[in-house]
Amino acid sequence: MYNYVMLMGTVVKVQPEFVVNQKYVNLTISCTRPFRNSEGEFETDELVIRCYDFLGELVQERLREGTKVTVKGRLRQSNRDGLCMIIGEHVMFMGEGEMHAIDADGKEDC
């Protein structure tokens, strides 16, 4: 079994959150579906990715609305309400003409 999510889209919002003893950043991205609906239009989804620790700090520091990103991560089901959330583990983005990549374990490639 393998739990893997990969999303490509545009940053809509970067929102830091604080819960008791835990800080994370919710990254909202807009993803356009690669096919047309019955009306012949492309639909767009806004998805929230939760980034913890070092990854969350760098996402908050470096990503802005309109930035193109690719996010690799996993789904996690909440014990409280049973809903699934996306947990970010690797974020790639273009900044100042260069590609940047950030891992949840603190590795950063430029």
What role is predicted for each listed range?
Residues 1-110:
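Single-stranded nucleic acid-binding surfaces, predominantly the OB-fold ssDNA-binding core
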